[in-house]
């Protein structure tokens, strides 16, 4: 039943069928022509489906059953931290005092919500080792851009208009160079060494008086901790640059190490990842930015302050970069993150990291005999394999990912980081049991054996999903991006 073909909602449509009846009009009827200019009025009626309420419910329920999420199965998407989202978060976020307020209310009427946001900021300050935090950015890349704009404002305020370059590792998230470009910087790539870490000699080569910042994820996207981080910070700071922390992998160091103690000047966090706000289609993000003291004047306004009379937003920020989002962040996600932090406590957050790292290393060691391991050393919260061995037998990493669909698993991240050939990037998170990990590992081993014994099974996968293998060339060259009503059948 789950895998049967599903008609489009337009194909379910029946002329004259309605799903909802409006009450009888009890006010004066107004014609569109009397309100809008003709340029804004449709010439032809929109081709909207005409369906009953039951049709709608069955249609979208059937589609939802095809979705894969953390609540329905293992989701080892590397660098995404697809951990289970505790349902107590949802209960707290639905409290009337949080769910039914409006951002334009008088501050005196939402002091409880403001207290929660202020306390969340204080928790994040402690977790990261920063001097203050703003909750305004909406998600990770938005936080990156905000942090880079703060760095830009800092340099310009100090007359360093020639600092136009941001350095990123060759293993960096794609959003790092993208955010730097949008913020008006030129990106310079620093190479990784044979151990998967930033090459210090290459870093010394590219750092100069034009360097605005070095962006790093620590541990990096190979799942390896940048053990030379203090020396890297010294190199950048001695050149007058700032050190930026991409918090995508913070799950690997919670209550174990703090970016602020490593020498980072700016950090963005992903509350929708590390701190269990639903993501991956489940809800909006939240990308708070933390800074050291010398960058505080440039934080986006307003900033949330605690006074003797309660909490208030301070708009008197002459050096601020301005607003980066209407109102003050995605409040509902912040409530969920606050609930998670308070539920876990410092010891719980430490355990999060310990189990995340344990799970990743366990999986890596079990899979290492069957796939190439580019960097054979202890990893942190995630690790990368390579499908080079399988590629020599005619099977690509993409084929392996599609074969996993047959077993009900969401595939890992593939072909990223870019500096690993046929990359397979796996992040199990701390919330998965050994039994779940073993089930996935067993299927990965089965696929590796199929590649050697019956490669066609993998090359032609998936076999059990509703949608089989797509014609990727045709999809790229002649994409169908909108519904087109089929022509009438000629009799």
From Swiss-Prot:
EC class of the enzyme, as a word = oxidoreductase
Q: Record's Gene Ontology CC terms?
A: cytosol; glycine cleavage complex
Cofactors named for this entry? pyridoxal 5'-phosphate
Keyword match Oxidoreductase: yes
Top-level taxon of origin: Bacteria
Q: Which family does it belong to?
A: Belongs to the GcvP family. C-terminal subunit subfamily.
User: Quaternary structure?
Assistant: The glycine cleavage system is composed of four proteins: P, T, L and H. In this organism, the P 'protein' is a heterodimer of two subunits.
Q: Which NCBIfam families match?
A: PRK04366.1
- PANTHER family per the record? GLYCINE DEHYDROGENASE (DECARBOXYLATING), MITOCHONDRIAL, GLYCINE DEHYDROGENASE, DECARBOXYLATING
User: What protein does this entry describe?
Assistant: Probable glycine dehydrogenase (decarboxylating) subunit 2
Organism for this UniProt entry: Bacillus cereus (strain ATCC 10987 / NRS 248)
Q: What is the lineage of its organism?
A: Bacteria, Bacillati, Bacillota, Bacilli, Bacillales
Gene, per the UniProt record: gcvPB
